[in-house]
Amino acid sequence: MSGNENHIYIAIDLKSFYASVECRERDLDPLTTNLVVADAERTEKTICLAVSPSLKVYGIPGRARLFEVVQRVKEVNQERSQKLPKRMFEGSSCFSDELKEHPELSVTYVTAKPRMALYMKYSTQIYDIYLRYIAPEDMHVYSIDEVFMDVTHYLNTYHMTAKELASKMILDVMQETGITATAGIGTNLYLCKVAMDIVAKHVAPDANGVRVAELDEMTYRKLLWSHRPLTDFWRVGHGYRKKLEEAGLYTMGDIARCSIGEERDYYNEELLYKMFGINAELLIDHAWGYEPVTIADIRGYKPETNSIGSGQVLHCPYDFEKTKLIVREMTDALVLDLVEKKLVTDQIVLDIGYDIENLTNPDIRKKYHGEVKADRYGRFVPKHAHGTANLDTKTSSTAKIMDAVLDLYERIVDKNLLVRRVSVTANRVVDEHMVSNETEFTQMDLFTDYQALAEKQKAEQARMEKERRLQNVTLAIQDRYGKNA
């Protein structure tokens, strides 16, 4: 039995968060409006950040590509038109309740361009609502739309059950922001997450439309040991599912039974460790409904190494020089991020992913003689470029980091190929005060002009101070007028 048996956790997930925000901004009902959040100015291959619940009813997944939405809505309209006397629509609507009442209307939807700053604003407002009830040290923000809470010591204070407390917070969020949410309650972090992700979808909503589900280790085994597919469970991806099913394990109950098999049996713990290595331990714990990690453990965790970075998929293939401008912009933004967080680094990593057109365009293809790899969609592309630049000292200097990145770019990127993905990462990141407090010792010799060296170091120090002032001014302007100022 885990050490969390006396704990009570709540997980809250904001329903179709991005789509709900866009609906509220338009004074539309998030539950009945057909809306997708996607940048239609790119291509129809762009991924939708969110799909509203009423569109999901048609079988459109939450992370569909825009062309999949277009195709599915077209199919739905073909099906609807077949039932009409003249097989012709008299109008259209993006509202599910109106579409149910009027079969003569075709299905349409609103396409909203993503606005991350707006979503962050809503998320912060909602987090502030949670803070009215729960102290920050008892919360873990899992993502922009999901949070975990340890409410063990709050229930007696508020004279509420965990379900009543979860419902109260969700109702406050709905009344103040218009965003609906779902909650899961469990005796550990895993169980509250699974209760929210799987069980809450099938429970009846309360009078305010709030869905809350509860699990402990025994009800988890009773309700979910036979649940399929395995990918519905936290931390089980398609790769895990494929491996498990190839071994004849289709449910969490199968995994739990496998873990207690004897050494002479085919199905035993060793089989799982052969498939997943040390990660099998977590999978076995979760199969039984165990999770030893607490929110206090998460908040107290200090990683051995830190990194900070960003990546982007370009909306169309870029040539060498255009991509270089993107790399320059991303590096500049990365350095400002380091300065804002008072961090320094001595290692930069650059990743460049090439576009499929490099192999489909005959003129480019004949110039390329390098390695070819299949991407995650099974398409063949030139092998991506990856490189690391090590700096002499830990720094947040724009000049030093930019020189290192651009030199790396020139060395590793094929000038003849078109680029589709770029990522820039600062590794081995530490607090700048840790570096400033370190004392450096230099071995002196008879041949160095130490006066000239001191003057050079003084000039470099002055340049660095001037650069830092400029960086701070840039950050102040961005803080006031936005990142694009």
Residue ranges and their predicted role:
Residues 135-139, 159-171, 202-215, 301-307, ...:
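Short, Lys/Arg-enriched charge-dense amphipathic segments
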Residues 148, 390, 423:
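Short aromatic/hydrophobic contact patches that present stacked aromatics
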Residues 152-154, 187-192, 352-359, 427-433:
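Short, internal active-site loops enriched in acidic
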Residues 407, 411-480:
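C-terminal hydrophobic structural anchor segments
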